[in-house]
């Protein structure tokens, strides 16, 4: 069962799902908001004996994102999802659930899925 958890402290369903999970995948953006959230929550959702995997998701096409710094601070990054102009366009058009035609992005997602399974 996959549960998309929120970052809100008062979200009981997310807290319960994270506490009950055998494996946790955390997707973080390499920006101030993502790193601040990680720093304040890094011990709260992980229980002993659970696997925790970090994935860094680049959502903006900015030149100076601190991607390397964020990856080194996370210690267990299994993958880096590259920026996708096509996916950004789909998000802005409200058709995010449509299949994207960005071949490089799709290939990277398939690689991540292979690591997970």
Segments from the language model and where they lie:
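Walker B beta-strand of ABC/ABC-like P-loop ATPase nucleotide-binding domains
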Residues: 2
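Conserved catalytic-core segment of NTP-binding enzymes
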Residues: 5-82, 88-89
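Generic hydrophobic alpha-helical segments
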Residues: 38-42, 105-112, 116
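Acidic-aromatic/histidine active-site loop/patch
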Residues: 47, 73, 100, 110-117
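C-terminal boundary of histidine-terminating zinc-finger modules
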Residues: 89-111
